[in-house]
Amino acid sequence: MKAAVCREFGKPLVIEEVTLADAGPGEVKVKLSAVAICHSDISYADGAWGGTLPAVYGHECAGVVETVGSGVTTVKVGDHVVVTLIRSCGHCHGCSMGNPVTCSTQFPLDAASPIKDKDGKSVVQSMRTGGFAEKVLVHESQCVTVPKNIKMASASLLACGVITGFGAVTNTAKVPAGSHVVVIGTGGVGLNSIQGAHVSGARTVIAIDVVDSKIEAAKSFGATHGINSKTEDVAARVLEITGG
């Protein structure tokens, strides 16, 4: 298969022929239809976050299940899925406490990358996904089925930006209905934090940014008010909007 491989930080990714291992026990091979670009991928490729090379970045993926390994029960061949970077066993302390991101289980895919270059040398599967490729091999816990009528390009966004912003409000902050919520920055994560606050029943959702068009866009995600921090006194406006 083809993959976009980072051979040198700060340089263009190189399209190469690579091989992907077969699905082992509990693993799923997904033929990708769409991969979003997260700023984390850019930071890695630029070398800002370091890391080992060569590597295949990309971790916001959506596609169709091509093959499954033994013991896989949550997805089947032909399913449309979103692929996330979180692997979890579902049984350790972290998982049992409802925090799969802290899963302590070591998976075979953590020990050895399933990606090899044309010379048979290992290529890092970045962020447990390696999504800038035609296919990925992941643990079944990383796959979430979605309806087949959802566009894959839209579904891929669910894999990181949406769950990061939405989950920060609903799972971490646990914002109760009737709250006042302020979200600083209306990028991908910020917009989904706004959406999470709206769905949670927040009475006031204030979007703060320096670009008026982004503030207006935030209102379509549930923001009730917008503040441009370049032209307005943020603290004073928040106090005014919320009644102190």
Predicted regions and their residues:
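Short beta->alpha connector loops at strand-helix junctions that form conserved
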Residues: 21, 85, 105-106, 147, ...
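Adenosine-nucleotide cofactor-binding segment
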Residues: 183-186, 196-244
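Structural signature of beta-strand start/N-cap positions in the alpha/beta core
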Residues: 71-74, 180, 203-204
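Nucleotide donor/acceptor-binding cores
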Residues: 1, 79, 178-179, 203
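N-terminal Rossmann-fold NAD(P) dinucleotide-binding loop
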Residues: 190-191
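NAD(P)H dinucleotide-binding glycine-rich loop of Rossmann-like/cofactor-binding domains
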Residues: 91-184
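Glycine-rich beta-strand-centered segment in the early N-terminal region that forms part
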Residues: 21-35, 46-96, 101, 145-149
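Well-ordered beta-strand positions
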Residues: 80, 134-135, 204, 225
